[in-house]
Regions:
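Predominantly soluble domains enriched in secretory-pathway, periplasmic, or organellar proteins
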Residues: 1-180
Length: 180
C-alpha cells in the first residue's frame, strides 16, 4: 500500500528583494510573496507552526509572521545585523547570532525583551541548541571557532577551534554530537 503524500508550506528568505516567498509544496506554486524588512536572512518556524521568525538583518530586528494570515504581526529586538538564530526546545527563547557586534543575543519571545548579550568570536553565524535545551552552540566564521554556551547562565563554557569558516551547527536528536 502506498503511503499518503505529504503537502507542506515552505518559507524562504529572499535577501535580494526583501521578501519571503511562501510555496505550497503540493503544487510547487508561490502562494504569496510577503514584503519583509531589509536584507532578510535566517528563518525558522515556531514549534506550534503558528509563526515564522525572520531576521531582518539591515533593520536589526526579528520579524514575526503569522502563518495563517501571512502578515507581519510583531517584531522582536536584536543586536546589529542578525544573521541566523535557533529557537529553544520549549519555544520560549530565540538565540540570535549578530554578525556586526560579535554577540549572541538571547531574546525572551513572550516579553519581547533581550535577556542577555553574549560575546563570541568574529562573524557569528551558525546556531544550534541541544535537545534538552541546556547547551547552545554558536560558530564564528572568521575565528573558526565553536562557542558552547550554558543556556541557564548565558556564559560561554568552552571555545573549540574547528575547521575554516563554520557556518552551521546542529545537534543530533540524542544530543550526543553536534555537527558544524
Amino acid at each position: 500500500m502506498a503511503s499518503p503524500s505529504a503537502a507542506y508550506t515552505a518559507y524562504f528568505s529572499n535577501e535580494k528583494d526583501n521578501t519571503m516567498p511562501v510555496v505550497d509544496t503540493a503544487t510547487m506554486k508561490v502562494i504569496k510573496t510577503v514584503e519583509v524588512g531589509q536584507r532578510p536572512r535566517g528563518i525558522t518556524i515556531s514549534h506550534d507552526g503558528k509563526f515564522v521568525y525572520l531576521c531582518a538583518s539591515d533593520d536589526d530586528t526579528i520579524e514575526v509572521i503569522d502563518t495563517a494570515t501571512l502578515e507581519i504581526v510583531d517584531t522582536l529586538p536584536s543586536g546589529p545585523d542578525p544573521e541566523l538564530f535557533v529557537l529553544s526546545p520549549d519555544g520560549k527563547t530565540l538565540y540570535v547570532a549578530n554578525e556586526d557586534d560579535n554577540l549572541v543575543t538571547v531574546i525572551d519571545i513572550a516579553s519581547k525583551k533581550v535577556l542577555s548579550e553574549i560575546p563570541v568570536g568574529v562573524e557569528p553565524e551558525g546556531m544550534g541548541v541541544s535537545p534538552d535545551g541546556k547547551t547552545m552552540v554558536n560558530t564564528s566564521e572568521t575565528t573558526s571557532m565553536a562557542h558552547f554556551i550554558d543556556t541557564a547562565t548565558h556564559e560561554v563554557t568552552d571555545n573549540v577551534l574547528v575547521d575554516t569558516r563554520p557556518r552551521y551547527a546542529e545537534f543530533t536528536p540524542d544530543g550526543k554530537q553536534v555537527w558544524f
